[in-house]
A protein has these predicted regions:
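Conserved N-terminal alpha-helix of the aminotransferase class I/II PLP-enzyme fold
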Residues: 67-115, 134, 138-144
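Conserved PLP-anchoring active-site segment centered on the Schiff-base-forming lysine
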Residues: 121-137
């Protein structure tokens, strides 16, 4: 019961109900009990050391892990604002863009997808999704929840764009559920000829496959920190072109999410010329980690990083062939260089093999969505795109498969 006026309070205070409640509390009937702490919470946390060769997260470099241990700063302290500015420059570098609205969303790669969709789409818009795996399905599902008119196609044909006349076209560049890399040449040009914006998912490909946002005419691109960048999950790099920002500024309705509003986030990250406004408290330690991860890529060179992933992918294919194992993606030009999918041989339980490797301290993963039970997924992201490590993981995989085939 809430007393909204002084009169109501006085009436309640002198009422029979008040006297009954007072006696009830005095009797101890509603005395709060002291909860017993969970026994497991009082034990020391155990975190084993593993080689993470699944689809993400990947292993962190020591310098990235160390960066997270730095002193916390306030989210509006000038020193932290400088770190955010460095991070923005690093993201422009790896995306290969001059877009002012380039920053990181506080959340996983999935938050990047949601941020892109809630800003670029509103009711009445048409959304064309190129579906080459699970993440196209996910983008379509999110848009349908928003009340958007969604059309799904299997390939980015110009005819489909001209027929549906969408406001936004979605393409997943690196599809982690299948290990496919989607060529993007010419798609941006077709989109712009019809007035559409091109939205690209690079969660599994940024830094490990060839991508140039500006040269490809990409209007919005998002990614994640826990794949090739080798940072912890928790931030979603994202970039909006001037075309995309113009569409957002001219929406008929406000962006439904304050948290994901690109204009608000852009101001917080220093993307505009306005006085910085408080938006939310960024995951400060994770920003430290991302800034450090981007510095590692910059020191190697973004093109050198990408070339290394392509070269080591060739090594994987040779090792698979030598051990009578088959890549799931048949055409080499469609294979994602930083995540290889391998066919599970007939009669072999994929999970038993994965469990054998896990017992050796090495993680690989099974399929996702339509590929469940059909493939293994081997991520060679960032520092794990290494000749010695790759030889080790393929050797363990081949040995585990041979063991299962001979049972």
């Amino acid at each position: 019961m809430f007393c909204r006026t002084p009169t109501a309070f006085l009436n309640f205070h002198s009422s029979k109900a008040h006297r009954v409640l007072y006696a009830f509390f005095r009797s101890g009937t509603m005395a709060l009990s002291t909860p017993v702490p969970p026994a497991s919470l009082l034990e020391e946390m155990v975190v084993p050391s593993r080689q993470l060769f699944g689809p993400g997260p990947s292993n962190m470099a020591d310098t990235i892990a160390d960066a997270q241990h730095r002193n916390l700063l306030g989210h509006l302290h000038p020193e932290f604002i400088k770190i955010m500015a460095d991070t923005r420059l690093g993201l422009q570098y790896v995306f290969k863009t001059k877009n002012s609205y380039t920053f990181a969303v506080s959340g996983t790669g999935h938050s990047g997808m949601e941020c892109a969709l809630v800003n670029l789409l509103e009711r009445g818009d048409r959304f064309l999704v190129v579906e080459i795996g699970l993440w196209g399905k996910r983008a379509a599902d999110l848009a349908i929840r928003m009340g958007i008119d969604v059309n799904i196609v299997a390939a980015p044909h110009g005819e489909a764009i001209e027929e549906y006349k969408p406001q936004v076209v979605f393409v997943c560049h690196g599809e982690s559920s299948t290990g496919v890399v989607q060529p993007l040449d010419g798609i941006g040009e077709i989109c712009h000829q019809t007035g559409a914006l091109l939205l690209v998912d690079t969660v599994a490909s940024l830094g490990g496959a060839r991508f140039d946002a500006d040269a490809l005419g990409v209007d919005c691109v998002y990614s994640a920190t826990q794949k090739v960048l080798n940072a912890p999950p928790g931030l979603a790099p994202i970039s909006f072109s001037d075309r995309a920002i113009e569409k957002i500024r001219n929406r008929k309705t406000r962006v439904a999410s304050f948290y994901f509003d690109a204009l608000e986030l852009g101001n917080y990250w220093g993307c505009d010329a306005e006085i910085k406004r408080y938006h939310h408290t960024a995951p400060i330690s994770t920003v430290y980690a991302l800034r450090t991860a981007l510095a590692i890529v910059a020191k190697e060179g973004i093109d050198a990083s990408i070339d290394r992933h392509y070269q080591n992918a060739q090594l994987i294919y040779k090792l698979l062939e030598a051990n009578s194992l088959e890549p799931f993606v048949e055409k080499e030009e469609w294979r994602l260089p930083c995540l290889t999918t391998v066919k599970v041989p007939a009669g072999v339980d994929w999970k038993e093999v994965a469990d054998d490797l896990m017992a050796e301290g090495v993680e690989i993963a099974g399929g996702l969505g339509p590929t469940v039970g059909k493939i293994w997924r081997i991520g060679t992201f960032g520092l794990n795109s290494d000749k010695t490590k790759i030889e080790q993981v393929i050797s363990l995989l081949a040995r585990a498969v041979k063991k299962r085939c001979n049972l």
